[in-house]
Amino acid sequence: MDQSGMEIPVTLIIKAPNQKYSDQTISCFLNWTVGKLKTHLSNVYPSKPLTKDQRLVYSGRLLPDHLQLKDILRKQDEYHMVHLVCASRSPPSSPKSSTDRGSHEALASSTSSNSDHSDSTTPSPSQESLSLVTGSSEGLRQRTLSQAQTDPAQSHQFPYVIQGNVDHQFPGQGVPPAFPVYPALSPLQMLWWQQMYAHQYYMQYQAAVSAQATSSAGSAQRAASSPLNLAHVPGEEPPPAPNLVAQENGPMNENVQMNAQGGPVLNEEDLNRDWLDWVYTFSRAAVLLSIVYFYSSFSRFIMVMGAMLLVYLHQAGWFPFRQEGGQQQAPNNVDANNDGHNANNLELEEMERLMDDGLEDESGEDAGEDASAAQRPGLMASAWSFITTFFTSLIPEGPPQVAN
């Protein structure tokens, strides 16, 4: 053996992987073997590990016991880092947690206090008593109410009570195993309730609109029929009908378009026209009027302007040239209703007079001739109707009128 190797000391820094002990500085010689180093560590290391339980690692290599340090350590390094790993053959038992000791102490104190006050105080049946349940596998404590355990049917009938207790549990208090934890309403149920609420709200709104329209029409009919019923009462004047007067003075908008749900149709073209659309419309009109003004006389320009104004007013509904028969007879409905009762009386009197005179046949022929003469139009009326129909057919019609 080289005698010079025995005189060369070397410094080793022993590190523990679990950081339980601080780094230990050990002085040895290069001619030592790994087994001799382990024996030295079993004497000087704080934990006094056994030689057979020690594992030395240097530069990621496990060192066997027969190798010498001079064959392993790098000579250019001043300090050599060696990791010591000890295999624990008899691991210490895990100490009891402070919470276990505290719970046992609290249970013992509560038992002693209950035994001290048992002579003076009687516990009520509804008093909540906490029971400690220890799980064999997980080791978790769960506290439940004794009332919920004694009456499980009531707990099943009212699961939200258990759910409220679960939300307000103390630390360390688990969920009762008999009742699953679930939310009150799932997201799908919330979406369904929102959809039903919107549907019901829309139906109520449509019913309110329809009821308002029906009530307004019914009030107008009652106002129109009230003077007829009171006209035959002697010594009483019929009360004024302000609603009827307002309806006679103001034009009735009978051309309101209704959608399928019962509400008025909103004209999207008028609502969606922005300032750019209006500028485009006015620019087209300005170009047309400038062409007419510069390439014709002033009188023709005035005529074209007047014609365009008439066409615009016709399309807007100010000058409806062709009205339906029902619309022409609409202003006369009130007068016809007012005179209906008197006309019926006159017809009855006329029928009685004709039956008395025996002139039913002759009066029937005269009435037929008068009706045919009244229905046969004259030559001027036919010509005027033809001319007006021809020229008004050249003018584009306005929006269609939907009768409700």
Curated annotation (Swiss-Prot):
Q: Which domain of life is it from?
A: Eukaryota
Which Pfam families does the record match to this protein?
A: ubiquitin
Give the primary localization class. membrane
Membrane topology type, per the record? Single-pass membrane protein
Annotated GO CC locations: membrane
Instruction: Name the residue ranges with Low complexity bias.
Output: 88-97, 109-126
Region feature Disordered, mapped onto this chain: 86-153
Compartment annotation: Membrane
Q: Does the keyword Chloroplast apply?
A: no
Q: Which UniProt keywords apply?
A: Membrane, Transmembrane, Transmembrane helix, Unfolded protein response
Regions crossing the membrane: 301-321
Annotated Ubiquitin-like domain ranges read 10-89
Q: Where is the composition biased (Polar residues)?
A: 127-153
What the entry lists under PROSITE patterns is as follows: UBIQUITIN_2
For this entry, list what GO says about its biological process: response to unfolded protein; spermatogenesis
Q: What does this protein do?
A: Could be involved in the unfolded protein response (UPR) pathway.
Q: Under which name does UniProt file this protein?
A: Homocysteine-responsive endoplasmic reticulum-resident ubiquitin-like domain member 2 protein
